[in-house]
Amino acid sequence: MNTLEAERRSTQELLVDGESDTLRLSFEDSITRAWRYRVTVPVIRDSGGFLDSAIDSWHRFFGLDPGDRRYYPRNQLVYFYSGKNRIDMQDSGTRIGDVSAEAGWYAADSAEHTISLWGGLKAPTGSTASLTSDGAWDTAVWGHAARRWTAWRVAVELGLAQPLGDEIFAGAAHVTSAFARVAATRDLGAVWSLRAQLDGQTRRVNGTELRFLGPSLQLTVGAVRQVTHRWRLQMGFVEDAAVNTAPDITFFLGIHD
């Protein structure tokens, strides 16, 4: 995940310039035919990274506006915010993030369609000093529905997220936010498939005009390869679709059963 976002308002200033690599270790299983659970442990590394040069070349090749990137050194790490609270992190490091647990009930689960309801709880196992945690327990509830055809699959999710506290933004992020996801997958034979996904979320921090802390919209484009009968390889990228509302670009690679 590579980001360079610089904003200044009358009472607030934000600079997010760095690269974050996250390894998510997840275990998912079924309790009964209708109930499933999932536990995820993230390992997060923040650094100056190495993708700034490649992103600059991408902008030049396609004639895109590089935004604030031209004014900042390459491969530096600065996470700075001044407002009700002050954040200034410039130290690289690898740390455990917030561990999450989720449980889902499947009202319907067949070859043609799926309907499920989920609830999640995130524990403050990360560090507020390294920005790998907000220092509070967080909850979320959402519904998921999917429809499958011979070569196409479409899925929709709608939910609410509620932090139970906030130690990063002095309580300003203790706000309920809504999120939504729409995904479409096209099978290309028995081995490969392509997927496009749109994720949106409402404001996550109150009392700010900073665009990066407001509503967000992200576009995911990726591919899935069936490696064995059980295992799948997923790869692709996530782009900030609304501009300056999320990390500039995120590349992902995952193995799932």
Where are these regions (language model features)?
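Transmembrane beta-barrel domains of Gram-negative outer membranes and organellar outer membranes
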Residues: 1-164, 169, 173-257
